[in-house]
Amino acid sequence: FQFDPLYEFLARQQHAARMRDVLTLTPDPGVFAFLFEYGVCVLCGYDYEAERRLVDLLLRYAVQPLEPVVEEELTYRRSLDDGVRIRHDLIELDDASELVCQALAHALAQSTRLASFETAIEETINRTRFIPETLARTGAIALSRRSLARERGRVYLEKAHIVLQFNLLDTPEFLWEYPE
């Protein structure tokens, strides 16, 4: 996201708070949106129409959005049991406070971002698979030196992109600041 302009806009429009690399929107009690600097949005308690409006707004501030936009839908509910449980696509919480939801949002956002890395790697492998397969089958590569260099360059760029962004998967500062 274009994070600073997004925050400035949202701070004028609705209740928005910024904590390092996360914007938190709380339009109503028990309704949260967590917007991560790296382009992932986790919503809790939004109805379908409000979700669509927010996503449409966020796309205006997106930088190189994935095509198509990746969406995952999970259900959460309050549970009388202690702690947090995730089974299939159901998250059960004994506490649906903003802090608990934000901690889960960090995990879900990182999972979504990791899935996008996996998709990009899979596409690169599928696009270049013919090179080692042809080499193994025929002993030669049916590409010019220039074409082969381009393919190697694309693979290198993909690797560099992922390595440079892999720090997104570190333990979020939020969890160090709020260990409870």
PLM region spans:
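Short Lys/Arg-enriched alpha/beta "domain-start" segment
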Residues: 1-95
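Hydrophobic side chains in well-ordered alpha-helices
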Residues: 6, 53-54, 113, 117-120
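Short, charged/polar micro-motifs that form catalytic or ligand-binding hotspots
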Residues: 44, 107, 148, 152
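Short, intrinsically disordered, mixed-charge
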Residues: 56-63, 119-126, 167
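A short mid-domain helix/strand-loop element embedded in enzyme catalytic domains
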Residues: 84-100, 118-142
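Glycine-rich beta->alpha junctions and the first turn(s) of the following alpha-helix
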Residues: 102-115
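Membrane-associated alpha-helical segments
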Residues: 125-126, 132-180
